[in-house]
């Protein structure tokens, strides 16, 4: 409960600072991008590590502030992640935010990629990596939506699936 409250407060603070922050700073620096990539990889591999909350806070604030990278939720399944806490709220916040962080990492690694479906699929793939890591720690963690998406990923159909459900203009 306390972690959920902290996460809500953080999101509200970051959202409130968005207009001012976007005007006050320039594009991300190479050092920041390297740190972001390191944090995202760490959160995908070890989403429950002791320092994961600090990394999520830094990534969220940074993502809101930088004008040169944005993430979107265009795929129905990405929007459905909002409802994960109705199924099991133990890890829902971590998984819900991971999709944004993994999209961010993909865009940093592939700056010329313009296909929103590809970017969205990368966000989901990163979320599924974090989900698998959580399940290794807690086998009782079950989210049917993510289980279905993992099945599609194993079949090599995740990107095609996302592309069919993409509601953004590009891709």
Locations of regions flagged by a protein language model:
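Positively charged n-region of N-terminal signal peptides that target proteins for export
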Residues: 1-4
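Bacterial N-terminal signal peptides
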Residues: 7-17
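Immediate post-signal-peptide N-terminus of mature secreted/exported proteins
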Residues: 21-61
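Short, solvent-exposed mixed-charge patches
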Residues: 168-171
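Residues at structural and domain junctions
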Residues: 8, 25-26, 45, 86, ...
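Mature extracellular/secreted ectodomains of secretory-pathway proteins
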Residues: 52-166
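Sequence-pattern detector for short linear motifs
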Residues: 6-7, 36
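Extended hydrophobic/Leu-rich segments
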Residues: 18-20, 100
